[in-house]
């Protein structure tokens, strides 16, 4: 029996609130193309209310209720949220799959990661108190100095549709751990589980206004949030083009932003690999999450000596991937998120073919699936570096292949991109792997694997992939401001000015 999509409202000041204009957006199951529910369509007026609620929560009781509360207080709520996520894991995973098309096994894995992320930042919230008032050594003995780390304030969090609840958690958990209050705007293409997060927060008694959730279109809710004068920082994950707009809207107020944008990441495979292992990692690196990963290693840079064998094995493996309704047991590739994304990916493949590339396999709808936004896992060869398929992010299950002969050529091809989120190198030569980790210009490098991600390690990229790092111990610092406190600690007068004569 299909799980019903709960009919939620916006979540503002700890309560469900109908959108000001009373509008709602359809939720479409990408596996069936059928509407399965609705989400509220928030607009600027709703964003105003959410920001006001966040500001009130930040300042309530002079900050003692949240922003200046002991880290252990905030940690208690984060751990309670984590426990509820695990309690509702099956329900949430199913909702995620219905909403965005992710295979159910992957969605369940995501829910474990969501809970783990809240637990991790709960620990950092507690340890933050121990890091306060850290002394600074000074060259003058008559001064003492220490540092405080304080919440940056009200933060606007704008998140994508490929990992709806997990990507939201990457921002919500550290922001709340730091003592910030937040307004979350998830993607209109996949907001269902983020609204369920609101229900979880209500259930655990999170103080009103600490987390507010406004769903709606990017132009109607996301844009007003990123430009809002009451928001002290914006953190965004999404496309390069939208990231530019967010930077521009924040610039007049000199508002800090952190951006995790697109990628066109390389995976370099040398001729000394175990071919079967390397083929699986190569396909996993591009086809995991239906190919909709910002860090997808979608440019295969393959040594010429093994190119023929490797490509033959990739095609065989790709044809063996189960493409099905993502609720089916064993599904390993579901539909892409929307009709718009489906048409965009088909156009990428068509353009590559028209420019002279060869479609080794895939690029079309599976014959056994008449409905849904499905595309077979696709491998494209005979690619030139000037082609669109090499240069632009597809965000779908499409892998392009380029061959190389020397290590220097491989490095040049790997760095031949405006992006710099991630990269992978597969080789049995550890020294070679080390060289490439240093040479590839990216924020994340995987060695003999692709796509592992742990909340304990920082995540973020270079170049047009954005700036700032999420996760890891530094993840909480994204939402903290450093305050220097310096004290004159001598009984002697400063003595810079001559004291006036006493009458």
UniProtKB/Swiss-Prot annotation:
UniProt keyword terms in alphabetical order: Cytoplasm, NAD, Oxidoreductase, Peroxisome
Residue positions binding betaine aldehyde: 161-170, 260, 292-295, 453
GO biological process: cellular response to anoxia; glycine betaine biosynthetic process from choline
Alphabetized GO MF terms: betaine-aldehyde dehydrogenase (NAD+) activity
Cystine bridges: none
SUPFAM superfamilies for the chain: ALDH-like
Residues at which 4-aminobutanal binds: 260-261, 294, 459
Binding site for NAD(+): 238-243
InterPro entries tied to this protein: Ald_DH/histidinol_DH, Ald_DH_C, Ald_DH_CS_CYS, Ald_DH_CS_GLU, Ald_DH_N, Aldehyde_DH_dom
Pathway entry: Amine and polyamine biosynthesis; betaine biosynthesis via choline pathway; betaine from betaine aldehyde: step 1/1
Induction line: Following submergence treatment, transient decreased levels that recovers after re-aeration.
Enzyme nomenclature, EC number: 1.2.1.8
Knocked-out gene: effects: Reduced crop productivity, but increased accumulation of gamma-4-aminobutyraldehyde (GAB-ald) and higher 2-acetyl-1-pyrroline (2AP) biosynthesis, which influences aroma.
pH curve summary: Optimum pH is 10.
Main EC class the enzyme belongs to: oxidoreductase
Family: Belongs to the aldehyde dehydrogenase family.
Protein's job: Dehydrogenase that can use N-acetyl-gamma-aminobutyraldehyde (NAGABald), gamma-guanidinobutyraldehyde (GGBald), betaine aldehyde (Bet-ald), gamma-aminobutyraldehyde (GAB-ald), acetaldehyde, 4-aminobutylaldehyde (AB-ald), 3-aminopropionaldehyde (AP-ald), 4-N-trimethylaminobutyraldehyde (TMAB-ald) and 3-N-trimethylaminopropionaldehyde (TMAP-ald) as substrates. Catalyzes the oxidation of GAB-ald more efficiently than Bet-ald.
Subunit structure: Homodimer.
Protein name: Betaine aldehyde dehydrogenase 2
Organism from which the protein derives: Oryza sativa subsp. japonica (Rice)
Taxon lineage: Eukaryota, Viridiplantae, Streptophyta, Embryophyta, Tracheophyta
